[in-house]
């Protein structure tokens, strides 16, 4: 293998922003944030969904609208879809 062409494969902390669950795994992801975990500094990758918050794994159903997309859609279209479907 050629030297210097492969990304840095290192330990990274992935943190689920909706449940504050985090785990350490190896990845080549480029991050700007860092976090101290177990007395060691790691790069931090923030994710919106993990096995701790995904409805398939938790068995619960919840609306995960972190960007306000559902509310924006409802303001724009209101109940027009409900009337058209009848």
UniProtKB/Swiss-Prot annotation:
Family: Belongs to the bacterial ribosomal protein bL31 family. Type B subfamily.
Protein name: Large ribosomal subunit protein bL31B
SUPFAM superfamilies per the UniProt record, alphabetical: L28p-like (SSF143800)
Entry keyword annotation includes Endoplasmic reticulum: no
Subunit organization: Part of the 50S ribosomal subunit.
InterPro entries: Ribosomal_bL28/bL31-like_sf, Ribosomal_bL31, Ribosomal_bL31_B, Ribosomal_bL31_sf
Gene symbol of the encoding locus: rpmE2
A cellular component annotation (GO) from this entry: ribosome
Keywords: Ribonucleoprotein, Ribosomal protein
GO MF, one annotated term: structural constituent of ribosome
Gene Ontology process terms (BP): translation
